């Protein structure tokens, strides 16, 4: 599960940046 959440968080951070 964490493995699927990490990429999601990275995507959100990239979108904000």
UniProtKB/Swiss-Prot annotation:
GO biological process annotation, one example: innate immune response
Modified positions (Leucine amide) in chain numbering: 17
A GO cellular component annotation in the UniProt record: membrane
Tissue specificity field: Expressed by the skin glands.
Protease keyword on record: no
Alphabetical UniProt keywords: Amidation, Amphibian defense peptide, Antibiotic, Antimicrobial, Immunity, Innate immunity, Membrane, Secreted, Target cell membrane, Target membrane
Entry's localization field: Secreted; Target cell membrane
Domain of life per record: Eukaryota
Keyword Membrane annotated: yes
Job description of the protein: Shows more potent growth inhibitory activity against the Gram-positive bacteria S.aureus (MIC=50 uM) than against the Gram-negative bacteria E.coli (MIC=150 uM). Has a weak hemolytic activity against human erythrocytes (LC(50)=135 uM).
Similarity annotation: Belongs to the frog skin active peptide (FSAP) family. Alyteserin-2 subfamily.
Name assigned to this protein: Alyteserin-2c
Annotated source species: Alytes obstetricans
């Amino acid at each position: 599960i964490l493995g699927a959440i990490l990429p999601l968080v990275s995507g959100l951070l990239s979108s904000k940046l």
